[in-house]
């Protein structure tokens, strides 16, 4: 074999599933690399930094931003190599040596004995509103995510969308904003029942069968002053003065990496990796964790992603070293943490 920097496992994606994969592979003493398309670690949780996350076992309700901080710290425990701003565009295999070759959009090449795909819902970008000139307001008061609830305090906010995220944002903002409006093309909202009920009982003013047709700028033409709504049933228009506009029309995802792979990675619904409960794909040596993995009994929670990650790493370890233990030793009795535990205990007994 010619001289290459060969890793035991390369993890594509650095959300909760990818970061826990990195931690667990370090626990199993594997040479690990993480490749992330975004300029930072944490994945889609960054879209909801102030939303409370309740369903991670052992954690009290935690804001998304805090959860990111914790999972990043854990994921980097064993110092994996981290590559940010890197989009993997193809995966192939060296037929002579058996290792995988990952090529990026920049032309960089990575070599790995195994791969864990942990890209969540894929490379996501918010679906933009199709109104001429809308992009110029993106630097002022046209928003595609809610990064800070405080930013909207005492403001008049218009939200466009009727799914879970739009309803969540409306419920979160209604108590602190001056006024919240929500416009949706359909007759009724499509979110979870409890969230819809909460919104219906709040002071949020909903405009159904309606959509934004125009942004009216202020005198300096750098901010949205009001929005024009069209009711497609009555064909009537109305105008609402606003301070902020939030668009939540879903996300566009780039799934070309898997769809156009030269390897026989079987997909479900032309996107998700068809796998097993042990995180195995249809290609030996390629595993999956998190939302991208599909199998009967799949748990679509962050907690489920952690189990996927551990399974993927254990199978990757045994793929490389067939006589390796099926799982890592639990952390409470693992010698790898002996020195770290001494340092932590000193902090606790001060």
Question: Residue spans of the language-model regions?
Answer:
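FAD-binding core/adjacent interface of flavoenzyme oxidoreductases
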Residues: 1-12, 27-28, 40, 81-155, ...
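FAD-site-proximal beta/loop scaffold in flavoenzymes
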Residues: 130-153, 244, 248-303, 311
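Short amphipathic alpha-helical segments
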Residues: 22-24, 46-47, 127-131, 170-172, ...
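Acidic, Ser/Thr-rich low-complexity intrinsically disordered segments
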Residues: 338-350
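Glycine/Thr-rich phosphate-binding loops of Rossmann-like dinucleotide-binding domains
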Residues: 20, 43, 125-126, 168, ...
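Beta1-alpha1 glycine-rich phosphate/pyrophosphate-binding loop at the start
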Residues: 7-78, 167-193
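A Rossmann-like FAD-binding core segment of flavoenzymes
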Residues: 75-104, 109-112, 174-275, 324-331
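A conserved FAD-binding loop/helix module that cradles the flavin
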Residues: 167-169, 292-335
């Amino acid at each position: 074999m010619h001289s290459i920097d060969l890793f035991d496992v390369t993890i594509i994606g650095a959300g909760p599933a990818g970061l826990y994969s990195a931690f667990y592979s370090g626990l199993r003493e594997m040479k690990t690399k993480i490749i992330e398309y975004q300029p930072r670690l944490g994945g889609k949780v960054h879209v909801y930094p102030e939303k409370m996350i309740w369903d991670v076992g052992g954690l009290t309700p935690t804001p998304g931003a805090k959860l990111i901080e914790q999972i990043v710290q854990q994921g980097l425990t064993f110092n994996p190599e981290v590559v940010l701003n890197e989009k993997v565009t193809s995966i192939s295999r060296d037929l002579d040596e058996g290792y995988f070759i990952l090529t990026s959009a920049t032309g960089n090449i990575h070599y790995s004995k195994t791969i864990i795909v942990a890209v969540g819902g894929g490379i996501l970008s918010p679906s933009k509103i199709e109104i001429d000139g809308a992009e110029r307001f993106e630097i002022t008061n046209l928003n595609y995510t809610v990064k800070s609830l405080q930013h909207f305090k005492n403001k008049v906010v218009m939200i466009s969308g009727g799914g879970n995220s739009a309803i969540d944002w409306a419920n979160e903002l209604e108590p602190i904003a001056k006024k919240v409006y929500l416009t949706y093309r359909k007759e009724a909202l499509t979110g979870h029942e409890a969230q819809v009920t909460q919104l219906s009982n709040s002071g949020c003013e909903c405009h159904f069968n309606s959509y934004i047709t125009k942004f009216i700028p202020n005198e300096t033409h750098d901010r949205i002053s009001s929005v024009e709504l069209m009711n497609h049933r009555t064909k009537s228009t109305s105008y609402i003065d606003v301070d902020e506009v939030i668009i939540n029309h879903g996300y566009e995802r780039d799934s070309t990496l898997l769809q156009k792979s030269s390897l026989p990675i079987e997909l479900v619904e032309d996107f998700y990796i068809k796998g097993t409960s042990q995180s195995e794909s249809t290609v030996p040596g390629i595993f999956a964790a998190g939302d991208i993995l599909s199998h009967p009994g799949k748990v679509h929670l962050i907690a489920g992603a952690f189990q996927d990650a551990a399974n993927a790493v254990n199978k990757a370890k045994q793929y490389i070293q067939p006589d390796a233990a099926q799982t890592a030793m639990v952390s409470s009795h693992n010698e790898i943490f002996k020195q770290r535990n001494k340092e932590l205990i000193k902090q606790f007994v001060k």
